[in-house]
C-alpha cells in the first residue's frame, strides 16, 4: 500500500507527468510489451547491451578447470563471482576466443556428414554457372515448391521416429520403423555417427533437413525444382532475371522427375490392356525407381501430376481436389453448378451428348506455361483473363477455356467429323473430342468467337483472333494480363474413387482425372526405372524386350525347366513371352514356333539330348501359335536395332551369347544373368550327391505322376517311388530307400544307373 500511495503522490506532481508523457516510452502498453513474458522482444538490442558488459556469458563451474583465469595479454577470462540466482560462473567473451585458439580439438570427421546438405549446397554453387542478367517484366506465379534440396521423402512422423532412434536410441517411447527407407536410413546414420561429439539437438535439426521435404508457396518464374529454388533470390527479381545452371543434381528432384515418367508410361500402357486398373496396380507394385519401390514413393511423394495422381488414386491414396482438363489444373474458387446431359449439334451436324454444367462458376486455371482466371455461366464464357510465357502458351489456354465453356459458337465451329480415339482405340468422350479437334486447328474457333471494343485497364490488353495483341479490340470476354494467376496453395487432400478405366472421381461424382489428361511428352528419366512387369518391357524398345525376356527365363529357370518337361503348353502361353512376339517377323512366327516345338519334343523323347542353353535360347520363339511345316532353320531372325539380327540355333551370336567359363549369358552385349547349374557337367556330381538315399529304378514311368524337382524329393516316404527331373532335363524313376545303412553306396551306384537309364 505504501508504494502505491507513493506512486500516486508522484503522479500528482506535474513534472512526473511531463517526463512520462514527453519521453518516447509513454504508453503502459509499450512498457508491458518490453517487460512481460519470457520472449525477448528486441533480441538485437539485448545482444548489443549484453555484449557491452564485462561478463555477458554464464558457464558451468567446470570451466574454471578448463580455462585459465587470464589470457596471455593478462585479460581476465572469468570472474570468481557467481551468477546471481544460479551456481554458474560469469565469463568474458574473450574466453570464447581463448577456447577457439587453445581449447581441445575434436575430430572433424563428422562435420561433413552432419552438415551434409550445406556442404553439398556449396559444391552445387561452386560448380554452377551464372549467366547474364536480363531486365524484363517477370510473370511470377506462386507455386508450391520444394525448398530443401537433397532430402529423402519421409513423412514428418516417420522422420521423427528415425531421428529419435539415431540421436536418442536409449530414450523411452514407442518407435516403430516400418518402411524400407526408414530402416535403411537409420542403419546408415547410426554407422556414420558413431562417437559423434556434435550436440544431439544440432544433429537432430540437420537430420530433419535431410529427411523431410519442406515446401513453401513462393512466387516463381522459371525452374521449380529445388536446386533452382535454393538460388531464387539470385535468379529473379521484380524486373530482372539472371540465367543460372545448377552445378549438380539432387536425388529428390530426380525422384520427382523419374516418378512422373514412370507413372505416365504405366498409365499409357495400362490404358491398352484388357483390365486397365488391375494392370496399373500390378505395374505400380512391381516397379522400382532408383532402387526404391514405386508404391513407397507414391505414398510419400507430394508431386501433383495427372499420371502420378491416377496411380495414387488406384492405390486408395488421397489426392488434390482440383481437376484436370486439357493439361490445365482447374480449381473452382466460387459459385456452383449442377450437371445435366444435353445433345448438341456440331458445325458438321454430328450429334454430341455433353454433360452441361448449369450455374455461375469461377475457376483458376494453372498450366506449365500459362495461367488464367475464368468466369462462366451455363454454356457461356463471361470473362477469361490469361497470362502466359508466349503467344503459343496463351493460345493453348484460350482454346481449353473456350471448349470448357461449352458455348454454342465453339461447338458450331467444328468442321469435319470428330472421331478421335485413345491408345486402346476407344472413342474419346465428347469434351475431349472437341478439345483435340481445336488443339489441331483453332482458326475457325477464334474467327467465329466474335470481337468487342475494350476499355483501357491497367495491366490488361486485348487479343485478336490471329493472336496479335491490341489495345482497342479483343475476342469477346478474353483479355491478356501481365500478372500471372497463383497456383492453388492448399495442400488439402480428398478421398477419391477410380473405375476400371482409370477415371478418377471425387465423392460427388465429378471426374477429376482420366487417362486422356496424361501428357504424351516423352522424357529420359534421371534415375533407373526398373519395370519388373512384362507389360512394361516394350517401353524402352526392342532391345529391352529381348534382354528382359531372357532375364526372366533365367531367374525362373527352376520352374520353367519342370514346366518345359511336364506341361509345355502352359509354359508357351505365359504372358511374359507376349512382348517378344513383336520382335519376330510376322511371316516367320508360326514356322519358327512349329520348328522349335518339334525340336523340344525330340529333346523330351530322346534321353540325354536335353540342352539347357538351347532351351533358354529358343523358348520365346515357341510361344507363337505354331504352323506345321517340315522347315528346318539354322538361325532365327529378330528385329532389333532397326534391322533383322540372327540368333543361331546351335552356337553363339551377338544377340545371344553364353560364356561357358563364367556361366553368364549376355544378350546384345548386356548381362542377362547366370545359370545356377552347369549345363555341361553331364549327370555326375550334383545329382549323385542329391540322390543319396534313393534307388534309381530306370526310365520315367508315367504311372508315378509328374516329375518332381530334386528339391521336392525329400517329401517322399520310405519305399515310395517317384519320377524325378535331373539336371540335364532327363526324367528317371527312383525309390526312397527303406534302410539308411546303404546310403554311402548310392552315390556311386546312382552315377552308373543314371547313365544306364539315360542310355
Curated annotation (Swiss-Prot):
**Chief place where the protein resides:** virion
Q: Which InterPro entries match?
A: Flu_PB2_2nd, Flu_PB2_6th, Flu_PB2_C, Flu_PB2_CAP-bd, Flu_PB2_middle, Flu_PB2_N, INV_PB2, PB2_helical
Subcellular location per the Swiss-Prot or TrEMBL entry: Virion; Host nucleus; Host mitochondrion
Molecular function terms in GO for this entry? RNA binding; RNA-directed RNA polymerase activity
Q: Which residues form the signal peptide?
A: none
Name the site position(s) for Mammalian adaptation. Answer: 627
Keyword annotations: Cap snatching, Eukaryotic host gene expression shutoff by virus, Eukaryotic host transcription shutoff by virus, Host gene expression shutoff by virus, Host mitochondrion, Host nucleus, Host-virus interaction, Inhibition of host innate immune response by virus, Inhibition of host MAVS by virus, Inhibition of host RLR pathway by virus, Inhibition of host RNA polymerase II by virus, mRNA capping, mRNA processing, Viral immunoevasion, Viral transcription, Virion
A single GO BP: DNA-templated transcription
Motif Nuclear localization signal per UniProt: ranges: 736-739
Q: Name one GO cellular component term.
A: host cell mitochondrion
Question: What domain of life is recorded for the organism?
Answer: Viruses
Q: Which family does it belong to?
A: Belongs to the influenza viruses PB2 family.
What other remark does the UniProt record contain for this protein?
South Carolina isolate has been sequenced from formalid fixed-lung tissues of a 21-year-old male which died in 1918 at Ft. Jackson, SC. Brevig Mission isolate has been sequenced from lung tissues of an Inuit woman buried in the permafrost in a gravesite near Brevig Mission, Alaska. This sample was recovered by John Hultin, retired pathologist.
This chain's function reads: Plays an essential role in transcription initiation and cap-stealing mechanism, in which cellular capped pre-mRNAs are used to generate primers for viral transcription. Recognizes and binds the 7-methylguanosine-containing cap of the target pre-RNA which is subsequently cleaved after 10-13 nucleotides by the viral protein PA. Plays a role in the initiation of the viral genome replication and modulates the activity of the ribonucleoprotein (RNP) complex.
Cite the record's note on assembly. Influenza RNA polymerase is composed of three subunits: PB1, PB2 and PA. Interacts (via N-terminus) with PB1 (via C-terminus). Interacts with nucleoprotein NP (via N-terminus). Interacts (via N-terminus) with host MAVS (via N-terminus); this interaction inhibits host innate immune response.
Q: What is this protein called?
A: Polymerase basic protein 2
- Encoding gene per record: PB2
